[in-house]
């Protein structure tokens, strides 16, 4: 390039007068549609099949349930891959439990009863442990005197302190 063309291009980029900062190039942001297209092409390569007529999907994680209502579900049994697409809602297990009970079979009901018993044992165990911990913390502040009172202990220390002075 010759010098004249270069100067002409530089002048078009400059926003102010001579000596001002040139404008910065605006970054082009990557959209989510490209990621979605890449994901769909990968899923197609795996060979997932769409599973129709699924009204709800619940994913249990710790004490939280991630719930999808009317999701798009795809699966590839050979690749051990399940894809759940849709808008998720995060709910607590206690909130969603009444809705789920009607969908459980007899085997799952037994498991649910066992879980409920474990939760009750943990809750009662935590209550007892908390009260015992509070009593132990209170005991740390107060010295234990066995067979004597505070007055007699103070009288015994006073003559010993006077004798050593």
From Swiss-Prot:
Protein's name according to its UniProt entry: Basic transcription factor 3
Signal peptide (from-to): none
Family of this protein: Belongs to the NAC-beta family.
Entry-linked InterPro entries: BTF3 (IPR039370), NAC_A/B_dom_sf (IPR038187), Nas_poly-pep-assoc_cplx_dom (IPR002715)
Assembly and interaction partners: Part of the nascent polypeptide-associated complex (NAC). Interacts with EIF(ISO)4E.
Gene Ontology CC, one term: nucleus
Region of interest: Disordered: 120-144
Ranges of biased composition (kind: Polar residues): 120-134
SMART domains (UniProt xref): NAC (SM01407)
Single GO molecular function: mRNA binding
Domain NAC-A/B stretches: 33-97
PROSITE patterns referenced in this protein's UniProt entry, alphabetically: NAC_AB (PS51151)
Keyword annotations: Transcription, Transcription regulation
């Amino acid at each position: 390039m010759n010098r004249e063309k270069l100067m002409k291009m530089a002048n078009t980029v400059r926003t102010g007068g001579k000596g001002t900062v040139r404008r910065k190039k605006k970054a082009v942001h990557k959209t989510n549609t490209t990621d979605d297209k890449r994901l769909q092409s990968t899923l197609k390569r795996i060979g997932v099949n769409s599973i129709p007529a699924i009204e709800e999907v619940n994913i249990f994680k710790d004490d939280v349930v991630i719930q999808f209502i009317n999701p798009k579900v795809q699966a590839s049994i050979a690749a051990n891959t399940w894809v759940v697409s849709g808008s998720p809602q995060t709910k607590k297990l206690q909130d969603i439990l009444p809705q789920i009970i009607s969908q459980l079979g007899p085997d799952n009901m037994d498991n649910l009863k066992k879980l409920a018993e474990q939760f009750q044992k943990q809750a009662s165990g935590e209550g007892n442990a908390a009260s015992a911990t509070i009593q132990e913390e209170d005991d740390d502040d107060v010295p234990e005197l066995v067979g004597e009172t505070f007055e007699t202990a103070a009288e015994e220390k006073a003559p010993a302190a006077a004798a050593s002075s």
